[in-house]
A protein has these predicted regions:
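Paired small-residue
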Residues: 110-117, 125-133, 334-342
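Conserved MFS/SLC helix-loop-helix module at the cytosolic interface between two early adjacent transmembrane helices
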Residues: 86-124
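Cytoplasmic helix-loop-helix junction between adjacent transmembrane helices
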Residues: 130-171
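Helix-loop-helix hairpin linking two adjacent transmembrane segments in secondary transporters
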Residues: 126, 163-209
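Juxtamembrane intracellular "pre-TM" segments in multi-pass secondary transporters
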Residues: 22-31, 212-245
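Helix-breaking motifs and short loop linkers at transmembrane-helix boundaries and internal kinks
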Residues: 65-67, 99, 120-126, 271, ...
Length: 432
């Protein structure tokens, strides 16, 4: 037997035990700057928001030109909400399977085309149909924007980015009616949709050149329709998701009631012009932006659920005051505007925190579906419940009907969240 000489081994150097790696604040940062990401996503979301707000001052003019009633014109706004609701439930799973970028490009292209189609409608029915299709297209931007945030950020970082997005999106409803009112001085209401079409073209260019794919192929989920339905079922049974989602739905119904009804209320009951309405609407939206910035400042001082509860309680108190003004006969354009400003301030606390709690409760692979279900319920509640403000004897929204729907929906938002959170805590204590 031959022996092979073996070089004596050096004693192995002691390898220190790996120290636990702290969880990064942002799991994956995009190659592009955060500023560019916020701008692109904000532009997309703002364009979708302009689809609902830019033409609000033109409601009376549209009703006259199309030979429609006020409720028929309001129905065109509801059609957008229905499109947003249905579209999101479809787009969410598709974005989890095929990525974010391609569905977004298709959605923005369809949004642009329908914006130009709105310029040539000849009846309220045709207008409503095109607006429904436009809402379906706008749903893509709404879903994908939230999903991209979840792809890139987590926890407080996601909350900060949602706050920044809400700030940008908040500028759209503030500037939209003002822009719409001023544009009406230079042309008919069709000009407003030409502007929307131009914004769609700009949004397409921003996505194509400035937004890389944020969902890697390794994290994409290929599900059949049955698996998607099972996922939605799990989401609906998860208190961590459904509590903020239902809260967001009822809260949006409160806000959307104001958005859809106040154009007629301010101009019919208080004698405001289209330009005056647009300025008042912008002032009230400024309240939401201020509330959003206060929310961002409170992130390190107060946890997300408490910020959400503070917003819910404040909004409920505000709309209760609006109802009180109506019942006591003290409602004037000034007092109503002041109360609505406070209500919108607290809405700035509700939206980003409810969105954060709902989306961050799910893993990245389910972010698109979770975002879709959140958006679907949000716009379904908004479109269905806000329409109740027009269910009066004349078929027109009044201050009283608007205030009533806003009080009911704000109470529902607060009650649902508190009930589900308390139930979840009691179950956790029982399990412990």
């Amino acid at each position: 037997m031959s022996l092979t000489a073996v070089r004596p081994r050096r004693p192995a150097a002691a390898v220190p035990a790996p120290s636990p790696t702290p969880a990064p604040e942002t799991p994956r940062r995009p190659r592009r700057s955060v500023v560019l990401l916020v701008f692109v996503l904000g532009m997309l979301s703002a364009t979708s928001s302009l689809a609902t707000d830019l033409y609000l001052p033109a409601f009376p003019q549209i009703a006259h030109d199309l030979g429609a009633t006020e409720s028929q014109v309001q129905l065109t706004l509801t059609a957008v909400m229905v499109g947003l609701a249905v579209g999101q439930i479809i787009v969410g799973p598709l974005s989890d399977r095929f990525g974010r970028r391609v569905p977004l490009l298709i959605g923005v292209a369809v949004f642009t085309a329908t914006s130009f189609l709105c310029m040539v409608v000849t009846s309220a029915e045709m207008f409503t149909a095109v607006r429904l299709l436009q809402g379906l297209a706008a749903a893509v931007s709404a879903v994908v924007s939230r999903a991209v945030v979840r792809d890139v950020f987590d926890g407080d970082s996601a909350a900060r980015l949602f706050s920044r997005l809400t700030l940008i999106v908040g500028l759209a409803p503030m500037l939209g009616p003002i822009m719409g009112g001023q544009l009406l001085l230079f042309g008919p209401w069709q000009l407003l949709f030409a502007v929307l079409g131009a914004a769609g073209v700009a949004g397409f260019a921003l996505v194509y050149f400035g937004l890389p794919e944020s969902l890697p192929h390794s994290e994409r989920v290929r599900q059949d329709p049955k698996a998607t339905l099972r996922l939605f079922g799990r989401l609906l049974r998860d208190p961590a998701f459904i509590a903020p989602t239902l809260t967001m739905g009822f809260s949006f119904a409160m806000t959307f009631t104001y958005i859809s009804a106040f154009s007629f209320v301010s101009q019919s009951e208080f004698g405001a012009t289209a330009q005056q309405f647009s300025i008042i609407f912008g002032i009230n939206t400024l309240g939401m932006i201020i509330g959003n910035q206060v929310n961002a400042a409170l992130i390190t001082r107060m946890d997300t659920p408490r910020r959400l509860i503070a917003g819910l309680l404040g909004a409920t108190a505000s709309v209760a005051a609006l109802g009180g003004l109506h019942l006591t006969g003290n409602a004037t354009l000034v007092t109503v505007t002041a109360v609505l400003f406070v209500m919108m301030f607290f809405t700035g606390l509700i939206s980003p925190n409810a969105t954060t709690l709902a989306i961050v409760s799910r893993p990245t692979s389910e972010a698109g579906s979770a975002s879709a279900l959140l958006g679907t319920l949000q716009f379904a509640f908004g479109g269905a419940l806000a329409a109740a403000a027009g269910l009066t004897s004349t078929g027109e929204a009044t201050l009283g009907s608007m205030a009533l729907v806003m009080v009911v929906t704000s109470l529902a938002a607060t009650g649902v969240y508190l009930a589900l959170v308390l139930r979840r805590r009691s179950v956790s204590l029982a399990a412990a």
